[in-house]
Each structure stands twice: as C-alpha cells, then as structure tokens.
Amino acid sequence: MSGLIHQSCLLFHARRSNLVAANSMRGMRGRPEMRAVVIGLALIASAASAQEQVAIVGGRVVTNAGAIVDGGTVLLNGGAVVAVNPAGAAVPAGFRQVDARGKWVTPGIIAGISQIGVAEVHGVDSANDTEADTSAASAALMLDGAFNPNETSIPISRADGVTSAVIAPKPGRTLYAGQGAIISLAEGQIAPTRARAFQYVAYGETGARLAGGSRPAAWIELTNGLEEAKRLQVGLMMPMRDQHRDLRITRDDAEALTLVLRGAHPLLVRVDRASDIRQILKLPSLYPGLRLVLVSANEGWMVANEIARAKVPVITLGMDNLPGSFEALGATMSNVGRMVAAGVTVALGTPDLDASFQPRLLPHYAGNLVAQAKLPGAVGLSWEQAFAAITRAPAEIFGLGSQGSLQGGAPADVVIWSGDPLELSTHAERVFIRGVEQPLETRQTKLARRYLPGQPAGELPVEYRR
C-alpha cells in the first residue's frame, strides 16, 4: 500500500505531451520508411551535437578498474571515457572543464533488477505491464514493448545517479515470465538499449503455485520448456509431427528458450530456499551452454560454496533479514557478505515489489552492507565490494563490457556526487550518460518550485482546478 500511495503522489500532475515532433511528421503520413529514416537521423544528430569533450577535474575518482584517484581528471569524448589522469595532469585543449574539487566522481549506478519504466503504478493493472496472467504466451513475451520513457520514476532515479537499469517481468500464467530488457535512463531515450536481454523464471513457492501446487510440478514445467526448445533446435518440434503430443508451451515460447540453450540469453531464476538453489544449480549440467543467474537467493549463504563452484552469479536486494516466508527462514543481512566471501559474484537489485520502482535507493542498500561489516558477529562488504555490486557486477553479469567502470573506452556514464555515494546524506550533483550531461529536474522538484512558500507567483503555472 505504501508503494501505491508513493506512486500515486508522483502522478499528481499529468505530464504534458510534446507535440513538436508529431507536428513535424504529419507531412509524412503513409510513408513509414521515410518517417523512420528522419527520426533516426534526428536522433543521431541530436546525440552527436549533445556530446562534447568534457574534463571532470579534481574529484575523488572511483574507477572500479584500479585504485581510487584523488584529485584526478576524467576525460570524456564521443560518449566514452578517454582516460582517467592523475592529480595535476594538464587538461587537453578543447575540453570543457567541470570542477569536481571536494566531490566524488564515479561510474553511474546500474540497477541489477527493477521494474522501472514498465509499471507506473503497481496496484493498477492498466498501468502495470510486468505480467500477463491470461496470455497464451509466456517465455516469448518481450518486456521492451511496454517500456515507457516518460514514466515518472525514470528522472527521479536518474537524478539520484542511476544511469542504466535491468527491467524484469513477473510470472503470470506460468513460471516463465518472459524476456527482460536493459534500459538507459538518459533523457530522450525512447527504446531499451538491449531489448531482449534475458529470460526470467520463478521457482520456489511462486513457481510451485503457478505450475500446479508443488515444487516437482514446477521442475517439470521448467525443464519441459527447455526440452521443447531443444527439440525445436534439432527440427523435431513440428505441427504435424507433434499434433498428438501433449505440448505444454507454444512454439513461440520454445523459440524464445532456444536463446537460453545457446547461451545468448542468461536464464534468471528467482529462488530463495537453499534446497531449491541446489536443484536449480543442476540446470547448467543438464543443459551445457546455459548461463544461469540466481535472483533473490535469501538462503544463498547456506550453499555459498556450491554457488561459487558452479560460477553462478547472484542478484539480490541484500536487505532481507526476516523470515518472510517458509522459503526464507534463513534470511540474514549477512547473506551477501557470506556469498561474496565464498567467491560468488553478487550484484544488488530491487526484485521485490515495494522496491522495484526505487532503484535510486541502491547506493543506500550498498552502504548498509558496509555498515553490516562493522557489527559484531555480522558479515558485510568492504566499501569497494559494495560499490562494485551496484556498478561493475551487474555489467559483468549481463555482458555490458567495461560499463560500470571509469577507464579508457568505457561508456561515459559518470556521476559527480556531493560526497561518499554510499552515505545517506550524499546526493548526485551532475550526471552524464554516454557523455551527455543530463537534466536533474523531477516531478518532485517541479512541485516544490510550484508550491513552496515565497515563490514568485507570476512565473509559475496555476494550481490544479476541477
């Protein structure tokens, strides 16, 4: 309920549509190929003109690729990091200098799992495209078709240093939820940067409920989908040949799962209980080439060595410390610290409903794991490990190359912070995505400017009227 109230407040003012682009295209009705060319050229020209040579000078630079550079200079050009130079290095001619003295400079935050951009209000079905309860399709569903770049939470998260996010569907009719996407939070980004990025599956209690009421039923449904995909790969799944077989998934679903079998898409499995994790860890040996990623894994610490041996990464919230269900009786805030200590790659995300539209809180979750390490008997993370969990680790899990770091050739997703980004009192002062400085205005800042006492009335819009 608190999440619904929060999101409803964000929608207090309706966003006005930008009609300029629509008006300019009216003369091209009936010529979709010309419209596509014009739109594409306009976007390229806009991005090229916005990118410039920038030197961020004098900050405490967290590279995620080596030691922290105090007083360093980060050079950006053409949407990429050119170099991170030491303190006192000369700034090349032609670079606009941005003063970061006394500030922290880091890679942008990457949300490991979220539902930002696809669920404006979770409690309203018409504003929530994360699940399809009655659709005949399941694994074939592609979440990118629901991405709304005008969603209220996107500029809010961008203003708090989040530059990219992994968005995941929720299971509806079956335990196969569908294909998630990866998005950039850049202003004007109208489509995901990677439309079909992974397959998302629910196991454990949720998977059991969707598959018929038990974990054995969930395992059969999970492996049946992969077996049908394997049959399709070798040409055995055909309409005439299979007309007398009891097919549990559609051909479209099977085609989507062939990408999982080939390793083109990671298979993200939401699972918590230690015994369920052991069961899911059997998948890579049953289907060689499958790239498995565990999501949530509240009891992962109990089988951390097995997860590490299997070289399977984990994406989790990291804040669960109460037995919220029978599959999470072993939940503890030492979970992430124990898994990382065992050698597991762990990224932080917001897979839970109340937090899924709030990836802006990830730095604070990471900071809590640093504090956890200071408690007697608890296991947490070092500062470097915690910050990597919200930057470099998700980039590694999803094959994003050098994103999540500041080094030559890395994407120029950079945030200048007022202080330590894992401290609660810190805020993002400037945000660059692919080398373009981003606006930090949000719905909240507009409302504050409109309604705070002492604002000059003549320069403000009228309040809402019925």
Stretch-by-stretch model annotation:
Residues 36-46:
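Bacterial N-terminal signal peptides
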Residues 48-52:
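Boundary at the C-terminal end of the N-terminal hydrophobic targeting segment
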Residues 61, 65-106:
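Histidine-rich, glycine-flanked metal-binding segment
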Residues 121, 128-134, 139-140, 266, ...:
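His/Asp/Glu-enriched, well-ordered alpha-helical/loop segment
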Residues 147, 153, 158-291, 427, ...:
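Polyanionic/metal-chelating signatures
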